[in-house]
Structures are given as C-alpha cells and as structure tokens.
Amino acid sequence: YDTDLTPFRSLNKVRDALGLVYAFGYDSVAAVIGHDAGSPLAAWCAVTRPDVFKAVAMMSAPFSGTPSLPSGYANESRSANLNRSPSVYDDLAVLARPRKHYQRYYQTPNANEDMWHATQGLSNFIRAYYHHKSADWRENVPYRLAGRTAEEWAKMPTYYIMDLNMNMAETVAEHMPSAVEISRNSWLPDDALSVYTTEYGRTGFQGGLNGYRMGASGIGRAEIELYAGKTIDQPSMFISGASDWGTYQSPGSFERMQERACTNMQSVHLVEGAGHWVQQEQSVETSRLLLEFLDGLS
C-alpha cells in the first residue's frame, strides 16, 4: 500500500503497451482492445498514438473523452467556492441507507486484505464477485441514471454502491451462487477459477487497487491535459453486456463516448445474456463482433 503511485499513471501504462508492440517486432497494430480498466487504457492508446494503434475496441467501461482544461476561473473566490461544494461521496454516507462508492473503498488500506484473506475464502470470494456482476444474477437490469447524485447512484447494486459498514468480501458473500447455479454455470469453469485463486493468492489485489488510488490522487493529470480536446478519430467500437451496470455507472459517459469522444464510432453492442464479463459469459458472440469489426478495417 505504501508505494510510489506514479508507475500507475495512464500514460505510463500506454508506454507499456507501446513497448509490448515493439517487443514483438511491430511498429503498429491493427487494433487495441480493452475490457473494464483496460477500456480507458485502450482509449488512451488510441488518443496518444494513432500512428501505432490503428483502431480501438472498448468493452464495459465507456470512454467519456479527454479532459478539458479549466477556463473561466480568473476570479479566485469563485474557484474557491466551487471547491467547497458538497461531495457526492459525502452525500452517499448520509442517505437513509448509508452507502459508499466501491472506488473509494478500493482506495482504503484495508481493501486488499479484506478480499485477499476473505472470511469465506479467496475462491468463494471470487466466485461470488463474478456471479454478482454477471447476467446470472437476475437483478442486474441496468438503465441510464439521471445524474451524478447520491440518490441516483444508490440505485445501483451494492458491488458498485456498497453499504457503508461493509467491505467487498462481505458484500458479495450475500450473493454467493447456490450449488444449482454453480452447476449450471458454463462460463466460469472450476479450472479457470482455480487459476484466479492461485494467482491472486500469490499476488493479492493491491497492484490493481493502486490504479484507483492514482486516479484519485491527481498524479498524471497535468500530462493527460496535453491531450485536452483531442478525439479518437480512428475506427472504434464498444461492446458491453446488456446486464452490465458498467455501461451506465458514470452518468453521461456512454453518450459522450458516442457523441464527442469518438468521431468514427462504427458500432455499439449490448450483448444479451451477459453482464460485466461479456467476453466470458458470451464468448462466441463477443468474438464474432470483434472479428467482424477487425475484418471491416482491411
């Protein structure tokens, strides 16, 4: 936890992706594809190096665009007043049912330990987490939220807007799939779950969690502002599960991606029968859509 967060900057990860391309002996690739946290990373690859990444496919997490530079705040007192405005995160905590945003929880010192050494065991934690965010959990029926307010955010499931006094392992334990549901699952086989359990048992989750801390810290903000107003102009596409709240968790991002961030958006697909893990829950359809997109580039 107590580590330098600068390696987790978005543009440093782009540099890693660029290094990988060159390590394989190429100077460009047909496309870059990213899911979840990899979706904005793929987008930033496309923004910063369109000469290398000729197209982009984003999955689950819409890219709302490059940041805008502050303007119109010459009046110092006005800026100070804006900085004192109430926080939606604070508002969540004082709802009738007190809540907290999962990304804020992931920034806490205890988050890694809570999940890594979950009371129910690591394997059961991962299984419950995957189930809770999948289409197998029938209450995943996402829709557009009216805005970025505590009241609207609180409409999302607890894996995104957690109960204030619970950690993530406790949160998903309440939605552990039954033996029947586990037996019917075709997209998270035991051998795959075993790999996840072994590897996360070895490494823990802190590396990934540091990405959330970096984002909230403001580290790297100045360097990405170099690309303020820049759009993704190469061919792009977006895929998400029809039951994935990730599409709508940041109100307005799904629309901004299509209307402003990407000027050559070729297709948007919300795949039925899939939640957050679209590439696993509906692997055949996801592969078909990606191949169709890639075939259309030539």
Task: Annotate each predicted stretch with a short phrase.
Residues 1-33, 40-266:
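Flexible "cap/lid" subdomain of the alpha/beta-hydrolase fold that forms the substrate-access gate
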Residues 263-298:
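Catalytic active-site module of serine/aspartate enzymes centered on a nucleophile-bearing elbow/loop
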